[in-house]
Structure formats: structure tokens, C-alpha cells
């Protein structure tokens, strides 16, 4: 009524641009609340087993856990395994060893919902904003959510959730991580000469792998050429049901929406795979010495650290899969675009660092302090002629408050 009375609405057709009274009355009985239809309670499960123990010479622990969860909407499930184990050994009075191993494996399966390259995270918003007078199917055919104009104003109107739930399209992600930490410690406390010297050798390694697969196909939606109601805005019977069954549901009254096939992702459908792997380790050797000789205190440290890392990734894309495709690489329809149906890329990188650290500290009666420090670092991130950098330093201190005359 407001628009009809607005003199600036010169192109307004009150019959077809506005809902009519018979349509408004019919809509009171319509409630295609898709969010309520598809929303479900998500179930989460978590199970774990723990083991631990100790003797005079060793202590140990182990844990394995399993977690699974499904989603509130659609086909979604996630599962993850975690494990941890460790042992500490007292090999001799002076020698100790430790080892810890941990890791996880996760897998997520979900329905691909990238209609016309929209975000796959928009399913909630699409269901929430779906007009509640528009059904998902009419006469056994999936319908585009065209509103009052019966035309496509936005690609999101091609989002038919029921159809998507019945496709084989998917997105799958897998992650796998393994971590190892080991160490040896030796104490020279038994030696009169080397007392105060401690050696430590530590090693850590991390391996991570990810893999993601996606498959999207194309599908067809329909629109009604002639709709129901005096303004032709509805999809359900208004008045004469015989007319609805004979005319509205006739095959000739259905036209393809969007002007052609609708893609779930890339035009024509696609198969996408990506894999990454990273492998790195760190090795440390440290020698610490600290000892007092009367009023003289001496401490020293020497350390070597070496790291190496490697990373690689592979990406592949294939378009125009067959309708019966199950995501395998041999299920592309090469008759459509020939050799242009596939593309791939890959990358690989390596890096490493090496560091030496030396430090000597001397203190007399906690009054006079002296420190010598030198550090040398090398990194493959720099040009070969600039691999190494050297950083020496000398510092001294005077504890004035320790002087006898200061207290007086």
C-alpha cells in the first residue's frame, strides 16, 4: 500500500510487483522454515585411555584419545586421534635419558556448498533467509528461490539445500602430525676435577602432513513460468487445484533457472586435490660448567644448535567431471575441453641453520663481574657468501653495594 501510494514509483505494476490479498492469505498457511527442517543436535564423543607407572630406575606414561563430532547442519563429521607416550630413565647415577612421542590424526568430511563460487560457510545464512513461502520442490523438480520478480537477482537464489544434500559433492580434509623429543644428560659430579660440568644432548623432530580433496558438480534448478495467485507470486495451489495440477505442474511450465547448469564451485564442476608435508628437526648440544673456588666463581657454557626443515606441496585441479564421478582423477570428461581439463602445480623448499654459542663468566666475591660471549650463526636464508654472522661481546660489572666502605 505504501509503494502503491508513492508517486515516485512510476514503473510499479501493483498486480505483479506487490503481493495480492489472496496470496497473503495463502502465505499464512505456508511455513517452509528450512533452518528448522535441517537443524539437528550435534553429537560429540570423547574417549581416552591413560597408563602410567614408575620404578626406581624409570617412569613412564602413555595416553590415547579419540574425539568425534558431527554438525548441526548437513553431512558433516569430524574425528581425531591423539596419542602421547614418554619415558624417563636413570641409566646410571650420572646418566639420564628421556623420550617423548606424540601425535594426532584428524579427518573432516563435509558437503561442498560453494554454489556459483559462494562461500561454503554460508549454509546457515542461506537457510535462515530463505523465503518461507517458497518450497524446495514443485512437482518433483528442484526450484530456485526466485522471489516476487520471478527472476535471478543473486546467485544465492540458486542455493537449493535439499538438492545439495543429495549430491555426491564433498570436501575432505586430513591432518597428521608426529612429534619426537629425546634427550641425554650426563653429570660429572663424581669427578673431583670435572665436578660442576653437565652435558646435554637434545633432539626434536616434527612431521606434519595435510591433504584436502574437493569435488563439485553441476546441477539444474527450475523456475515456474506461470505461478499461482492473482499476482503470480506463489508456488502452491491458490484456489482451483485442478488448474494447478494441469497447468502449473505441466512440464511446459517449468523453465531452467539461471539460464543453464549451476555449478557447485568452478563452472562445469571440478575435482581439486592439495597435499602438503613439512619435516624439520632440531639438534642441540650443551655443556654447562659452574664451580666456586673460594671467593672465585667460574661458569661457562658452550652450545651447538643445528636445524633443518623441508617443505613440499602439490596441487591439482581437474574440471568437467562426469556426473557419475566419485572423485577419482580418471573420472574427468575430456571430451568437453580436451587437454585444458587439468592443471597442477608443486613446490619444494629447504632451509637450515647452524649456531655456536660460547660464554665464560667470572666473579670475585660477588663484587667484580666479567663476561665474555661470542655467538656465530649461519642460515641458508642468506646468500652463500653471507651465511655466517659473528657476534662477540664483553661486559663487566662492579657490585658497589658489596664493598665494605659502602656499608659504612
Regions of interest found by a model, annotated:
Residues 1-75, 112-115, 344:
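Residues embedded in well-ordered regular secondary structure
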Residues 36-41, 167-174, 270-277, 343-351, ...:
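Short acidic-aromatic active-site loops that bind/stabilize oxyanions
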Amino acid at each position: 500500500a505504501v509503494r502503491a501510494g508513492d508517486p515516485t514509483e512510476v514503473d510499479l505494476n501493483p498486480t505483479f510487483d506487490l503481493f495480492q490479498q489472496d496470496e497473503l492469505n495463502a502465505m499464512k498457511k505456508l511455513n517452509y522454515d528450512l533452518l528448522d527442517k535441517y537443524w539437528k543436535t550435534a553429537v560429540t564423543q570423547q574417549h581416552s585411555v591413560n597408563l602410567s607407572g614408575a620404578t626406581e630406575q624409570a617412569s613412564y606414561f602413555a595416553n590415547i584419545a579419540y574425539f568425534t563430532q558431527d554438525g548441526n547442519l548437513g553431512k558433516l563429521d569430524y574425528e581425531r586421534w591423539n596419542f602421547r607416550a614418554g619415558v624417563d630413565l636413570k641409566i646410571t647415577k650420572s646418566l639420564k635419558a628421556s623420550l617423548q612421542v606424540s601425535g594426532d590424526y584428524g579427518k573432516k568430511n563435509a558437503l561442498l556448498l560453494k554454489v556459483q563460487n559462494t562461500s561454503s560457510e554460508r549454509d546457515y545464512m542461506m537457510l535462515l533467509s530463505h523465503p518461507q513461502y517458497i518450497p524446495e520442490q514443485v512437482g518433483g523438480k528442484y526450484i530456485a528461490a526466485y522471489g516476487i520478480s520471478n527472476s535471478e537477482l543473486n546467485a544465492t537464489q540458486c542455493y537449493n539445500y535439499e538438492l545439495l544434500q543429495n549430491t555426491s559433492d564433498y570436501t575432505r580434509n586430513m591432518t597428521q602430525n608426529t612429534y619426537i623429543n629425546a634427550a641425554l644428560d650426563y653429570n660429572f659430579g663424581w669427578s673431583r676435577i670435572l665436578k660442576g660440568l653437565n652435558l646435554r644432548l637434545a633432539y626434536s623432530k616434527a612431521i606434519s602432513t595435510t591433504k584436502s580433496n574437493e569435488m563439485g558438480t553441476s546441477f539444474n534448478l527450475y523456475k515456474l513460468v506461470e505461478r499461482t495467485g492473482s499476482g503470480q507470486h506463489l508456488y502452491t495451489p491458490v484456489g482451483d487445484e485442478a488448474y494447478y495440477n494441469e497447468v502449473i505442474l505441466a512440464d511446459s511450465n517449468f523453465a531452467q533457472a539461471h539460464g543453464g547448469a549451476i555449478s557447485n564451485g568452478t563452472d562445469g564442476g571440478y575435482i581439486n586435490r592439495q597435499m602438503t608435508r613439512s619435516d624439520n628437526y632440531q639438534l642441540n648440544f650443551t655443556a654447562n660448567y659452574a664451580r666456586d673456588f673460594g671467593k672465585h666463581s667460574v661458569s661457562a657454557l658452550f652450545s651447538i644448535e643445528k636445524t633443518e626443515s623441508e617443505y613440499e606441496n602439490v596441487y591439482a585441479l581437474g574440471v568437467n567431471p562426469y556426473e557419475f564421478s566419485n572423485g577419482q582423477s580418471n573420472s574427468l570428461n575430456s571430451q568437453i575441453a580436451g587437454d585444458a581439463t587439468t592443471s597442477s602445480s608443486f613446490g619444494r623448499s629447504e632451509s637450515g641453520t647452524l649456531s655456536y654459542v660460547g660464554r665464560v663468566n667470572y666473579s670475585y666475591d660477588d663484587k667484580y663481574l666479567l663476561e665474555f660471549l661470542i655467538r656465530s650463526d649461519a642460515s641458508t636464508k642468506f646468500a652463500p657468501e653471507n651465511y655466517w654472522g659473528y657476534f662477540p661481546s664483553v661486559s663487566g660489572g662492579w657490585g658497589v653495594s658489596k664493598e665494605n666502605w659502602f656499608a659504612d
